[in-house]
Amino acid sequence: SGGERQMVAMSRALMMDPSVLLLDEPSAGLSPVRQDDAFIRVSDINKAGVTTIMVEQNARRCLQICDRGYVLDQGKDAHEGTGRDLLNDPKVIGLYLGTLGTDAA
């Protein structure tokens, strides 16, 4: 499946011992259990000192494991902060739920 290919691609990238890892939706196509595995793995990679830049649709999950997060609105940087700050920011929640326009920043 596409999700399994994601996990294999991540493993192959890690074999190169990178200092920075770029991930494009690492949980895409995975079952909920495998999504948990993917996020645990990303968290472990980050804790091991590998800078991880991730694009992810599952904002809540992503912000739970990241040190810093950036929320884009119409391709522009709208908000930046710790995961906790962003998860508690009403404007970010509004953007995520689609209840705020592009002038939310």
Give, region by region, the residue ranges found by the protein language model:
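A short, proline-enriched helix->beta-strand linker immediately N-terminal to the Walker B motif
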Residues: 15-19
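A short, surface-exposed alpha-helical micro-motif characterized by mixed small hydrophobic
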Residues: 62-64
